[in-house]
């Protein structure tokens, strides 16, 4: 019967000697993270394999693409002895997922992921991060597109290559998030991470063309892409938020995030200067003439777009689909199609800057706990619930 079979399995497991895990000893400072070089899929995999030997993090596969390439996530894992209950951690501290390279020709976010990870593992200010935040990095989501893009840029290293924007089937696969069965299997990575970590915040690091382009005059471009004729800023962002009054607290957190990002970027003279220069050009040659086609919402010398929706269980953005779980869904955009060399590094540093200040905001957040202890019909009932959203301050 079942009990006999279970007993046999238990006996075999008891007779199996425990595997001794080799201690991790590699330092991230000794890994070549290619901070000034465009990272293709092969280089990404080499870095991932080395990161598996670095203490303080857990590197694990989250999906396999349509063509068989692997997607990985990096979790900054607390160093506890014994069993680590993720359920209890989620009830105690917030979670953030930082996704990179969803569109493969938007190249700087992969560099930024590895550069950010290095700072988080080596700087004293982040020593307590694993105790205050569940942080997960996905350095390269669109692995098939990245492989295609890397081959194309060998001949034309600064072209935009929108042909490599999507996956190997030419699909915008974010529309397949939260589906249990999809041919666009790379979409399962975000779905699995979301189910496991229930993130309070989703940050998706993207990019836009790094120079003027002519496609909007070709007669076949959709209206949405005409707006990208001219770079508007080194870095700008989108906040996807719900309008429902019961989730007003979510909007408040988004506004604080807008503020701290603007202050952080203003602290870097080179980034601030490019933001000022490009936004002035965009205003003169685009927004001032056709504000509907070329919108721009200015705040502290930054441009941000606020995209409101009613809560919708079928929406692709988690802040709209599950607003009681995800407080913020933020899309960053740097002008990196296709960036190379020192300019690529600058774009990556812009991503790192806004990622860092957001992480610091969450580390300093106040979490409201609902703790209950009751007795009912001779049974003791206890609960320990972290209420969302968290409380953040400027």
Briefly describe each language-model feature range.
Residues 1-6, 10:
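Single conserved hydrophobic/aromatic residue that forms the stacking wall/gate
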Residues 12-34, 98, 236-244:
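Acidic/histidine-rich, surface-exposed loop or edge segments in extracytoplasmic proteins
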Residues 35-89, 93:
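Soluble metallo-hydrolase cores and metallopeptidase-like ectodomains found primarily
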Residues 68, 101, 137, 203, ...:
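Divalent metal-coordination and catalytic microenvironments
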Residues 90-95, 108-111, 115-250:
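Active-site/substrate-binding loop(s) of hydrolase catalytic cores
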Residues 95-98, 330:
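Conserved beta-strand elements of the Class I
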Residues 161, 172-175, 345-394:
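C-terminal or late-domain output modules
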Residues 211, 221-243, 273-370:
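Active-site-adjacent mobile loop/cap segments within catalytic or ligand-binding domains
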């Amino acid at each position: 019967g079942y009990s006999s079979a279970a007993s046999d399995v238990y006996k075999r497991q008891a007779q199996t000697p425990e595997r001794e895990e080799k201690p991790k000893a590699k330092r991230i400072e000794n890994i070549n993270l290619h901070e000034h070089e465009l990272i293709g899929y092969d280089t990404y995999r080499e870095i991932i394999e080395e990161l598996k030997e670095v203490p303080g993090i857990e590197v694990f596969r989250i999906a396999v693409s349509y063509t068989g390439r692997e997607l990985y996530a990096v979790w900054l894992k607390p160093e506890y002895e014994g069993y680590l209950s993720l359920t209890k951690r989620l009830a105690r501290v917030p979670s953030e997922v930082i996704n990179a390279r969803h569109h493969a020709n938007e190249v700087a976010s992969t560099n930024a992921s590895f550069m950010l990870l290095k700072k988080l593992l080596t700087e004293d200010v982040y020593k307590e991060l694993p105790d205050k935040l569940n942080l997960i990095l996905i350095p390269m989501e669109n692995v098939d597109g990245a492989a295609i893009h890397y081959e194309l840029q060998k001949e034309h290293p600064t072209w935009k290559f929108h042909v490599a924007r999507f996956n190997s089937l030419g699909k915008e696969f974010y529309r397949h998030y939260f589906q249990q069965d999809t041919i666009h299997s790379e979409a399962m990575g975000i779905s699995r991470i979301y189910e496991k970590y229930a993130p309070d915040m989703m940050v998706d690091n993207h990019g836009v063309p790094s120079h003027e382009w002519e496609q909007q005059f070709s007669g076949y471009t959709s209206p949405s892409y005409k707006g990208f004729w001219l770079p508007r800023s080194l870095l700008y962002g989108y906040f996807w938020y719900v309008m429902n009054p019961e989730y007003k607290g979510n909007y408040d957190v988004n506004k604080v995030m807008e503020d701290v990002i603007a202050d952080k970027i203003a602290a870097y003279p080179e980034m601030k200067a490019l933001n000022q220069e490009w936004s002035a050009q965009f205003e003169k040659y685009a927004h001032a003439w056709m504000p509907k086609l070329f919108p721009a919402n200015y705040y502290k010398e930054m441009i941000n777009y606020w995209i409101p929706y009613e809560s919708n269980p079928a929406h692709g953005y988690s802040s709209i689909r599950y607003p009681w779980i995800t407080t913020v869904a933020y899309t960053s955009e740097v002008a990196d199609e296709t960036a190379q060399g020192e300019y690529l590094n600058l774009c990556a540093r812009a991503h790192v800057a806004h990622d860092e200040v957001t992480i610091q905001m969450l580390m300093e957040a106040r979490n409201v706990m609902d703790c209950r202890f009751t007795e009912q019909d001779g049974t003791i009932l206890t609960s320990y619930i972290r209420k969302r959203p968290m409380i953040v301050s400027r």
